[in-house]
Amino acid sequence: MVYDVTMLEAFYAAYKGKVEHVRAILKRPLTLAEKILYAHLYDVADLKDYKRGEDYVNFRPDRVAMQDATAQMALLQFMNAGKDQVAVPSTVHCDHLIQAYKGAKADIATARLTNEEVYDFLRDVSSRYGIGFWKPGAGIIHQVVLENYAFPGGMMVGTDSHTPNAGGLGMVAIGVGGADAVDVMTGMEWELKMPKIIGVRLTGKLSGWTSPKDVILKLAGILTVKGGTNAIIEYFGPGTESLSATGKATICNMGAEVGATTSLFPFDGRMATYLRATGRDCVVDWAESVDADLRADDIVTDEPSNYYDRVIEIDLSELEPYINGPFTPDAATPISEFAEKVLLNGYPRKMEVGLIGSCTNSSYQDLSRAASLAKQVTEKNLSVASPLIVNPGSEQIRATAERDGMIEAFERLGATIMANACGPCIGQWKRQTDDPTRKNSIVTSFNRNFAKRADGNPNTYAFVASPELTMALTIAGDLCFNPLKDRLVNHNGEKVKLSEPVGDELPLKGFEQGNEGYIAPHGAKTEIRVKPDSQRLQLLTPFPAWDGQDLLNMPLLIKAQGKCTTDHISMAGPWLRFRGHLENISDNMLMGAVNAFNGETNRVWNRSTNTYGTVSGTAKMYKSEGIPSIVVAEENYGEGSSREHAAMEPRFLNVRVILAKSFARIHETNLKKQGMLALTFVDKADYDKIREHDLLSVSGLVHFAPGRNLTIILHHEDGTKESFEVQHTYNEQQIAWFRAGSALNTR
């Protein structure tokens, strides 16, 4: 038993009373999200009817989860906080640093050898401060959290953008940067702008080829990659009860791709069944005792337009399978229209690799349904046209799938079973290809499909689909294949149709534990060592405080054009090895961003040398000369993962300001936490006024205050000047972070 019984018992004992108190004070019906949020206020004396999308609120989450790539920087910051133990139950999960190459056994052995210094550091820090530690191979953070820690009505933060996966068990689970996680682990208040709430009413029931993944793929097309920003997506309606807990988790997981703060479902019998199957009967008993407050009030779901900021309806009975992409997860296309899209746009029609897994789709049910299709290859005398890669979500899933014949079904097709880890989904894929720059198509059951993300090739057209559809397209090897109507030719020359996928929601024989890989903290005063000459880890030095003056005559480091995700700002893949070494990882800063003035990546004007150079190299030179710089960008800057390195790297290299048309939620918070200025255009057309050789000043910082605009002054190379207003979302506390140099400096 790794979950925290004492904490859970106390939580449920107090939960009903807290919700009743909220209802009495607010004097109105409550959505599920509101019940959970208000029940987690840091100080009940602060209770009032907060304005959604406007008011900042202090919360007290129940727990923290961290993956190994982001945990390094989070724990380096925590070590500077002067605490002996974490204030809430916390865990570290080693899932990001394992590169997919030869297969699970070999890859885990390589990872342990390659990352020994980092793993030892994370294990020792975890032991020292009372943090649970999950070893490499134990599983993907979000699957392990779902199996062991998530609980209905709870609230958690995680240093990974797909933390909302726990919403599949009715939990408000929010992806954050490491500095936010440190707030929670030190027992401080954790600040969040009160989210708006988007209600999604589900009716009907899935059938045939349609899966829970298709719900969120369709919704991504409706909301786009930023339509859920600063909002919680709350699912309700009779259709929710037809979805398994892991299916719900899939939907919540990919809410990150529309920018949602989190997503969640109401507690129901499917969640109870999953909790019991994973050994948490007592959680079910406690949740059932307060089940009326683990869903929205009846009047809310009866009259949703009066209580949600937006209402979207999806009929599961009419839903088609979807394929989203390429290059963005909101390019949603139903399978009935996909072949036409492939031909019209000239996408590489041949599907070169199918990949099943990731935190989004690696549950027992996912593998069970995909395996039912794999078995048809033998049964119908077919062959598989494309290579298949499978990443189970956890050791528990892998061991159970092996016992129940699923692994054998995949391996019979020549599939490579990779480690229970993230692998290709985050760019940890040593792909073997004849030409790493060739145009090609892959289909995955992952969540993101940004350019270069999976394999580093900008010409890999990555499409996101359900595990079932990924498996079918792998068998066919053809993006234009529609398994709902098309047939394949078998070895006998017969035209055969794939039968609809089937599978069990949960294993009939129960879960196999396998080699779990959990290490409980032993509480001893473990010595933590970081070698001074380490290339993987580096102790942090506090950032300097603001000098009290306006920021004057800053050179433009880069004016980024188009999509600029955290992958563009701080690439993962081969750079993951430097996630604990701020100086080294800063070498990748903004190397993927497109320069608006020349259309190139990692090539910007260096005014100190009057030549072009790399982004990080140019910033380093400015820093060495004591010159701060500024970055300008377009919409939804910082979309994607929660990695705070995308904020810490610019701060480390003396970039003081990011001026964008809009920001992704997590990244904007990360910038604020690191003492940077995150500003937005009042008039987005002012973006076009900024020239390559401009010097930019920020005026008004002496009177920096909530709701008060600042002024940007452009000093053009020809001696002329222009100015325009910019806005911000800083409150008094966040302004204090800026003045102190970072949030950590205010502790």
Whereabouts are the PLM-identified features?
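Mobile "lid/hinge" segments at catalytic clefts and subdomain interfaces of large enzymes
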Residues: 3-4, 68, 151-284, 382, ...
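Extracellular/luminal Protease-associated
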Residues: 236-241, 624-663
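Active-site-proximal loop->helix
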Residues: 191, 399-409, 665-680
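Long, structured ligand/cofactor-binding scaffold of large enzymes
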Residues: 8-11, 15, 20-195, 579-631, ...
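Flexible inter-domain linker/hinge segments
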Residues: 5-7, 16-21, 36-42, 46-47, ...
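Accessory "access/gating" subregions that flank catalytic or transport cores
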Residues: 109-113, 118, 123-158, 234-237, ...
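Acidic, glycine-rich flexible loop/linker segments
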Residues: 488-505, 667-737, 744-746
